[in-house]
Curated annotation (Swiss-Prot):
It comes from Adiantum pedatum. PROSITE patterns: RUBISCO_LARGE. NCBIfam families: PRK04208.1. Pfam families: RuBisCO_large, RuBisCO_large_N. The gene is rbcL. Keywords: Calvin cycle, Carbon dioxide fixation, Chloroplast, Disulfide bond, Lyase, Magnesium, Metal-binding, Monooxygenase, Oxidoreductase, Photorespiration, Photosynthesis, Plastid. Its EC number is 4.1.1.39. Binds 1 Mg(2+) ion per subunit. The basic functional RuBisCO is composed of a large chain homodimer in a 'head-to-tail' conformation. In form I RuBisCO this homodimer is arranged in a barrel-like tetramer with the small subunits forming a tetrameric 'cap' on each end of the 'barrel'. Belongs to the RuBisCO large chain family. Type I subfamily. Gene3D superfamilies: Ribulose bisphosphate carboxylase, large subunit, C-terminal domain, RuBisCO large subunit, N-terminal domain. GO terms for cellular component: chloroplast. This is Ribulose bisphosphate carboxylase large chain. The active site is at K152, H271.
C-alpha cells in the first residue's frame, strides 16, 4: 500500500493526512496502514483477496513528507480509486476515508487535512440548492455583503416575543435574522408557533422597508421525516430560507433537505454546530476545510466559516483558504493557506461563507476587507446589544456596512 512510484490519476480522490506514528513505527509503515485500512485492507491476508483485483481497488500512499518544526509528524498523501465510492454520497465518502482508520494502534494521532475531489466525482453531486448568484437574484441584493443576526437569548423566549425581536431587527435594516442552532422545538417555544410568528414579522418588515427579508427557520429535528415536515411548513408560509445543523443532523439528512430546497425554491442556511469537536485539535481529527468541501457537495447556500476577528478561533490565511474553497470555481494549491491540492469544482454553485461569533460594528472595516462582497456578516450581540434596542442596533450595522462598502468603492480608507 506504500507505493511512492504511483502516478495519481485525474479521477483519484486524493487525501492529505497529518499522522503522528507511535514511537518505533516507521512513517512508511504508518502511511501504508492508513491507505490500507481506509480502502481494501484488513489486518491479515484473506483467501477472498484472490477473487478480486486489489490493485484496481486499493488506496495507495504515494508520498510522505515530514512536517516542518514538528517532531515525528508526517503528511501522508493517499490516492483512492474512484470506484471505492458511491456516487452522490458524502456519507459514503467519509465512511470510507475517515470511518475506521482513526482508532488505529500504529498511530498516536491522525488528522485529515485536505481532500482533492475530482470532477468525475463532484459531478455526481447536486451541490448547493441555489448558490451565490441565484440567491442574490432571489433577494435582489447586490454589491455588498448580506447582514444577519442571531436572535438572543438563544433559549427561553416565547414564540411571540421571539417574532417581535425578529421584526425589530429586520425593520432596522438587516437582511436576515437567524434561529440559534439549538432552537428546535422546545417546551417554551414549539416550532410551529415560532414559524408562524416569524412569518408575520417577515411580511410586516418587508412591507415597511420594501426589501426582501429572511429568517433562517431551523428545520433540524430528531428524525428526517420531522425535519422535512418543518421545511414544508416553512415553504407553505412563504419563508425564503430554512436552516439545518449539518454535522449533528448528519450528511444524509442534509442532502435530502438540500434536494427539497432546490426543488421548492427555498434557500438553505447551514450551521456547523459540533465542528470544533472534530476540527479543533491540530494533530487529530478532520480540518474544517474538509468539512466545508463536504458541505458544498452535500448542499447548502450559506455556511458558518469563522470570523478571523471575533470570539472564536480562526487564523486569517487558513480561514480565507477555505472561504475560497466554498465560493470559487477553481482554487490553486497553496500550502501557506492550508490548501494541499488544486481543486476544480467545474461550475458547481458557490456557498456564502457566514462570519459569525463575537463581532460588532467596530469589526466592520476588517470584515468587509477580509470577506469581500460574497459573504454574510452575522452580528448577534453586536445587534441586540445596542443600548437603544434591536432596531437601532440593526440600523448601526447597516449604516456601518454601507459606509465601508462606499469607502472601498471610492478607494478611500
Amino acid at each position: 500500500y506504500y507505493t511512492p512510484e504511483y502516478k495519481t490519476k485525474d479521477t483519484d480522490i486524493l487525501a492529505a493526512f497529518r499522522m503522528t506514528p507511535q514511537p518505533g513505527v516507521p512513517a512508511e509503515e504508518a502511511g501504508a496502514a492508513v491507505a490500507a485500512e481506509s480502502s481494501t485492507g484488513t489486518w491479515t491476508t484473506v483467501w477472498t483477496d484472490g477473487l478480486t483485483s486489489l490493485d484496481r481497488y486499493k488506496g495507495r500512499c504515494y508520498d510522505i513528507e515530514p512536517v516542518a518544526g514538528e517532531e515525528n509528524q508526517y503528511i501522508a498523501y493517499v490516492a483512492y480509486p474512484l470506484d471505492l465510492f458511491e456516487e452522490g454520497s458524502v456519507t459514503n465518502m467519509l465512511t470510507s476515508i475517515v470511518g475506521n482508520v482513526f482508532g488505529f494502534k500504529a498511530l498516536r494521532a491522525l488528522r485529515l487535512e485536505d481532500l482533492r475531489i475530482p470532477p468525475a466525482y463532484s459531478k455526481t453531486f447536486m451541490g448547493p440548492p441555489h448558490g451565490i448568484q441565484v440567491e442574490r437574484d432571489k433577494l435582489n441584493k447586490y454589491g455588498r455583503p448580506l447582514l444577519g443576526c442571531t436572535i438572543k437569548p438563544k433559549l427561553g423566549l416565547s414564540a411571540k416575543n421571539y417574532g417581535r425581536a425578529v421584526y425589530e431587527c429586520l425593520r432596522g435594516g438587516l437582511d436576515f435574522t437567524k434561529d440559534d442552532e439549538n432552537v428546535n422545538s422546545q417546551p417554551f417555544m414549539r416550532w410551529r408557533d415560532r414559524f408562524l410568528f416569524v412569518a408575520e414579522a417577515l411580511f410586516k418588515s418587508q412591507a415597511e422597508t420594501g426589501e426582501i427579508k429572511g429568517h433562517y427557520l431551523n428545520a433540524t429535528a430528531g428524525t428526517c421525516e420531522e425535519m422535512m415536515k418543518r421545511a414544508v411548513f416553512a415553504r407553505e408560509l412563504g419563508a425564503p430560507i430554512v436552516m439545518h445543523d449539518y454535522l449533528t443532523g448528519g450528511f444524509t439528512a442534509n442532502t435530502s433537505l438540500a434536494f427539497y430546497c432546490r426543488d421548492n425554491g427555498l434557500l438553505l442556511h447551514i450551521h456547523r454546530a459540533m465542528h470544533a469537536v472534530i476540527d479543533r485539535q491540530r494533530n487529530h481529527g478532520i480540518h474544517f476545510r474538509v468539512l466545508a468541501k463536504a458541505l458544498r457537495m452535500s448542499g447548502g447556500d450559506h455556511i458558518h466559516a469563522g470570523t478571523v476577528v471575533g470570539k472564536l478561533e480562526g487564523e486569517r490565511e487558513v480561514t480565507l483558504g477555505f472561504v475560497d474553497l466554498l465560493r470559487d470555481d477553481y482554487i490553486e494549491k497553496d500550502r501557506s493557506r492550508g490548501i494541499y491540492f488544486t481543486q476544480d469544482w467545474v461550475s458547481m454553485p458557490g456557498v456564502f461563507p457566514v462570519a459569525s461569533g463575537g463581532i460588532h460594528v467596530w469589526h466592520m472595516p476588517a470584515l468587509t476587507e477580509i470577506f469581500g462582497d460574497d459573504s454574510v456578516l452575522q452580528f448577534g450581540g453586536g445587534t441586540l446589544g445596542h443600548p437603544w434596542g434591536n432596531a437601532p442596533g440593526a440600523v448601526a450595522n447597516r449604516v456601518a456596512l454601507e459606509a465601508c462598502v462606499q469607502a472601498r468603492n471610492e478607494g478611500r480608507d
